[in-house]
C-alpha cells in the first residue's frame, strides 16, 4: 500500500482518524507500506512545514522520530520504470510510480481526482483512508 503525502500529514495532525490508524497498523506489521526515495523526501519536506507542526502540536524532533520510524517499517521501492505522464498534476507522478514499481494493491489518498483512472490501469485500487481501513479490518 502506498500512502500519498496528504494521508501521512493527516495521520500526524489527527491521531484519532483513519490515516493515523493506517500508520499504526503499519507499525504493528498489519499492513505493508511502500516508499521510494522521492516519496520519502516529499514526506519529509511537507511533514516538517510549520503549519503542520503547529496543527499537530508536534516539534521538528517529534516528526523526525516519526519519519525515521517510517523508514524502518516501510518497504523500500526502487523506481526502475517511469510511466510519465499519467496524471494531470506532475507532483503526484512519484506517488503513482512508487505504487506501480512496488506492485501495490492500493494507493491511499484524499486527492482521488488528481489520480483519476491511472492507478486502475495498472491494477491498483485508489482508496480514501477510511475505505482502506474498512477493507483491512
Language-model region placement:
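Short, well-structured N-terminal submotif of metal-dependent ribonuclease cores
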Residues: 1-35
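Alpha-helix capping/helix-boundary segments
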Residues: 7-8, 39, 113-114
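Short, flexible loop segments at the rims of nucleotide/cofactor-binding pockets, characterized by
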Residues: 10-11, 82-88
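Short, flexible helix/strand-to-coil boundary loops that buttress conserved ligand/catalytic motifs
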Residues: 12-13, 47, 119, 137
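Short, hydrophobic alpha-helical packing/hinge segments within bilobed ligand-binding/sensory domains
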Residues: 22, 95-96
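PIN-domain endoribonuclease scaffold, especially VapC-family toxins
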Residues: 25-82
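Acidic, PIN/NYN-like endoribonuclease modules and their adjacent C-terminal/linker elements
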Residues: 86, 93, 100-106, 112-137
Amino acid at each position: 500500500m502506498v500512502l500519498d503525502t496528504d494521508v501521512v500529514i493527516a495521520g500526524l495532525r489527527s491521531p484519532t482518524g483513519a490515516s493515523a490508524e493506517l500508520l499504526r497498523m503499519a507499525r504493528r506489521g498489519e499492513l505493508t507500506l511502500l516508499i521510494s526515495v522521492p516519496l520519502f523526501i516529499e514526506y519529509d519536506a511537507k511533514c516538517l512545514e510549520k503549519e503542520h507542526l503547529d496543527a499537530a502540536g508536534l516539534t521538528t524532533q517529534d516528526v523526525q522520530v516519526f519519519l525515521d520510524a517510517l523508514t524502518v517499517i516501510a518497504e523500500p521501492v526502487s523506481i526502475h520504470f517511469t510511466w510519465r505522464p499519467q496524471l494531470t498534476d506532475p507532483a503526484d507522478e512519484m506517488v503513482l510510480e512508487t505504487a506501480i514499481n512496488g506492485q501495490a494493491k492500493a494507493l491511499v489518498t484524499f486527492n482521488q481526482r488528481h489520480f483519476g483512472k491511472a492507478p486502475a490501469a495498472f491494477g491498483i485500487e485508489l482508496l480514501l483512508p477510511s475505505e482502506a481501513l474498512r477493507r483491512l479490518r
